[in-house]
């Protein structure tokens, strides 16, 4: 068999196939199946800070149907447990994913994911300003501020999921592709 080893985020992968967030990456059984099928790494579904009004299980929404209730209110404890279980069960890198809202939330949950054993972290940043006068550079600054804050708080590799709506990714990346 061909040697498909490669590197992603500084991590050695046995193959270039990275299973992105999907229903399969949301369970330990699905993660094991992906590893057995040849995935080189897995990206867990995002933990959404704005959905975490409480640290523990929440009450189901009144409008939720029976199929919606299974994972509702799982909160960060269940997510961090999945990170820890995946790390213990798999031989491939586990990338946790975070969609934060507040600067403190980005840092707090990123640190917890690292402590749970994540090999790397995907920052799923999607910032939509409701302020009409906010300039593009101010929006970019928000993204860079989040990345810098998480970088200072953690020691694992970071990937940043960007919106396709940036007007100048090269400018945002700065000289030589290095963040400003």
Task: Give residue ranges: language-model regions.
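Short linear motifs at secondary-structure transitions and domain/linker junctions
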Residues: 1, 16-19, 70-72, 135-136
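N-terminal amphipathic alpha-helix/helix-capping segment at the start of soluble metabolic enzymes
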Residues: 1-18, 79-87
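Alpha/beta enzyme core
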Residues: 27-59, 74-95, 99-180
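Glycine-rich phosphate/pyrophosphate-binding beta-alpha loops
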Residues: 21-25
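An N-terminal domain-start capping segment
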Residues: 9-13, 70-73, 100-101
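A generic short-segment signal for beta-strand/edge and adjacent turn/coil regions
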Residues: 9-14, 63-66, 91, 128-130
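Active-site gating loops and adjacent loop-to-helix segments of metal-dependent hydrolytic enzymes
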Residues: 57-70
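Short, basic, glycine/proline-bearing loop/turn elements
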Residues: 11-20, 66-69, 157-158
């Amino acid at each position: 068999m061909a040697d498909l080893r490669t590197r992603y985020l500084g991590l050695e992968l046995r193959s270039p196939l990275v299973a992105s967030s999907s229903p399969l990456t949301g369970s330990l059984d699905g993660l094991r199946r992906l590893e057995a099928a040849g995935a080189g790494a897995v990206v867990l579904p995002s933990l959404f800070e704005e959905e975490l009004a409480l640290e523990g299980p929440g009450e189901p929404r009144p409008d939720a149907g029976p199929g919606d209730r299974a994972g509702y209110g799982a909160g960060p404890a269940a997510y961090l447990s999945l990170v820890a279980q995946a790390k213990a069960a798999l031989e491939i890198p586990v990338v946790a994913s975070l969609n934060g809202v507040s600067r403190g939330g980005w840092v707090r949950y990123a640190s917890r994911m690292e402590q749970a054993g994540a090999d790397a972290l995907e920052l799923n940043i999607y910032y939509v300003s409701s302020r009409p006068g906010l300039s593009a550079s101010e929006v970019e600054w928000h993204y860079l501020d989040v990345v810098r804050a998480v970088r200072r708080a953690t020691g694992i590799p970071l990937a940043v999921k960007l919106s396709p709506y940036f007007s100048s990714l090269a400018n945002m990346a700065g000289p030589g592709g290095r963040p400003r």
